[in-house]
Amino acid sequence: MYGIECTTILTFLISLILLNYILQLLTRIMDFIIYRFLFIIVFLSPFLKAQNYGINLPISGSMDTAYVNSTQENIFLTSTLCLYYPTEAATQIDDSSWKDTISQLFLTKGWPAGSVYLKEYTDITSFSIDPQLYCDYNVVLMKYDEALQLDMSELADLILNEWLCNPMDITLYYYQQTDEANKWISMGSSCTIKVCPLNTQTLGIGCLTTNVATFEEVATSEKLVIKDVVDGVDHKVECTTTTCTIRNCKKLGPRENVAIIQVGGSDILDITADPTTAPQIARMMRINWKKWWQVFYTVVDYINQIVQVMSKRSRSLDSAAFYYRI
């Protein structure tokens, strides 16, 4: 009995000694590897050059990250500002150096040379096809035109909000909208949209799926169409695909690095009437004007206040879309 107990104790002690030896050996090996690795890094670092590559997020993407400190003072020192204006403005001003003048005026407000870009567009309808909002902050000057109220409203809805879109193959599939945030957006030189709602047996409601002439025409020869149909109902869609593209889109929320300044007009376009705009708030500003020089002077004068209520390349579901009016 005594011999068995001694053997057990000796076996336990030998195991402890062996385990301790193994742990010490592993520690020395790890120290050797780590120190050698650090030595190689330190030795080679003066001879290596590396670049940190980031992800280039699209302007229409839903992955934009909010900048917490975007409202701090002097944010324009490291930011870019795009000011979009119609061709009419440059025609009326008729001065070959007017852009240089505007740049110098922006400099007095703290925007350094090279940070402000003046971009011209022909008209609202052509601008709506491809806005190209590339800057950290984008301000669009949009002159009020009573005949283009619907186009102005749709353009505002398009660029003041984030959209997640997928192409639609209308030749093969039926489509339905799931909720109020789900819209069909068409863009092109000429978009004519016709729809035929279907019942549960995929038969047309008030139309024949085999006869496009019986479809309901919801848009005719437009450049931008944001179309809303009855939710939860399949539709057969007909579109002039040769001159127009159509996408199934979901409104994600306001795009806070874009502002629209409505120039003139007795009416103010209210895009907050759309139930998908939450909360139901709009920020507006208004002044009297007669010349485009007055418009640009006002924009320069108020630019820092405008930018302070925007967010640099961000999207927030807790803030409203920004719509300004001169």
UniProtKB/Swiss-Prot annotation:
Region: CNP motif, residue numbers: 165-167
Keyword Transit peptide appears in the UniProt entry: no
Single GO cellular component term: viral outer capsid
Covalent S-S links between cysteines: C82-C135, C165-C249, C191-C244, C196-C207
Subcellular location: Virion; Host endoplasmic reticulum lumen
Gene Ontology terms, MF aspect: metal ion binding
Protein residues bound to Ca(2+) 1: D95, G206, T214, E216
Keywords: Calcium, Capsid protein, Disulfide bond, Glycoprotein, Host endoplasmic reticulum, Host-virus interaction, Metal-binding, Outer capsid protein, Signal, T=13 icosahedral capsid protein, Virion
Glycan attachment residues as annotated in the record: N69
Post-translational modification: N-glycosylated. The N-terminus is blocked possibly by pyroglutamic acid.
Region (GPR motif): 253-255
Binding, Ca(2+) 2: Q177, D228, V229, D231, D301
Pfam families the record matches: VP7 (PF00434)
Family the entry assigns: Belongs to the rotavirus VP7 family.
Function: Calcium-binding protein that interacts with rotavirus cell receptors once the initial attachment by VP4 has been achieved. Rotavirus attachment and entry into the host cell probably involves multiple sequential contacts between the outer capsid proteins VP4 and VP7, and the cell receptors. Following entry into the host cell, low intracellular or intravesicular Ca(2+) concentration probably causes the calcium-stabilized VP7 trimers to dissociate from the virion. This step is probably necessary for the membrane-disrupting entry step and the release of VP4, which is locked onto the virion by VP7.
Subunit structure, interactors included: Homotrimer; disulfide-linked. 2 Ca(2+) ions bound at each subunit interface in the trimer hold the trimer together. Interacts with the intermediate capsid protein VP6. Interacts with the outer capsid protein VP5*.
Protein name listed in UniProt: Outer capsid glycoprotein VP7
Provenance organism: Rotavirus A (isolate RVA/Equine/United States/FI-23/1981/G14P4[12])
